[in-house]
């Protein structure tokens, strides 16, 4: 089994203006992997560039991959996968996931997952809170469709997922 070392900016030199790069070099000598929850995604990228161990994005303003993985695993747990093995790469292939809510970090990550795993996302966001496709980083609009009406976005969906309607 493993152990967890939980550090906040108050528990480390990160809160005392030590460069992220230096913290990455030191911390990664003591652990097998690092998970970071922070606001700016660039902080994770900088840490990872100087780390000796894998770095997991626990949450940033731009992305929330751990939550999307948890949602996908919950889908597999309740609905199974196409081949009955629980294979992550096939579980949503050809399916439709409806996203209703703010075009935030979770919406961005659902779009990335759709492109990687071969499903379609139906997006319904409030006006002024749309997904910024340059942040989401999707290469093609083939993996998503945008709907003004949330009910239309959810019609025929295999999975409906949501978050706040508008972030504060």
Question: Can you say where each PLM-predicted feature lies in the sequence?
Answer:
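Surface-exposed loop/turn and secondary-structure junction residues enriched for glycine/proline
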Residues: 15-17, 23, 71-72, 109, ...
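Glycine-rich phosphate/diphosphate-binding loop of Rossmann-like nucleotide-binding domains
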Residues: 1, 78-162
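Phosphate/diphosphate ligand-binding glycine-rich loop within oxidoreductases
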Residues: 1-76
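Short glycine-rich anion-binding loops that position phosphate/pyrophosphate groups of nucleotides
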Residues: 40-41, 164-168
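Tryptophan-centric aromatic hotspots in well-structured domains and transmembrane helices
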Residues: 54, 99, 165-166
């Amino acid at each position: 089994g493993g152990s967890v070392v939980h550090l906040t900016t108050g528990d480390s030199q990160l809160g005392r203006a030590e460069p992220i790069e230096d913290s990455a070099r030191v911390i990664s000598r003591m652990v097998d992997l690092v998970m970071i929850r922070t606001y700016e995604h660039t902080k994770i990228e900088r840490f990872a560039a100087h780390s000796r161990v894998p770095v997991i994005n626990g949450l940033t303003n731009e992305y929330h991959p751990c939550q999307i993985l948890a949602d996908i695993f919950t889908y597999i747990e309740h609905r199974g996968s196409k081949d009955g093995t629980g294979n992550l790469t096939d579980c949503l292939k050809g399916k439709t996931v409806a996203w209703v809510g703010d075009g935030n970090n979770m919406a961005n990550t659902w779009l990335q997952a759709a492109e990687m795993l071969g499903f379609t996302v139906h997006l319904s966001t409030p006006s002024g809170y749309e997904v910024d496709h340059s942040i989401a980083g999707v290469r093609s609009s083939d993996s998503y469709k945008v709907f003004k009406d949330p009910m239309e976005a959810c019609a025929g969906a295999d999975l409906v997922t949501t978050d706040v309607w508008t972030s504060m």
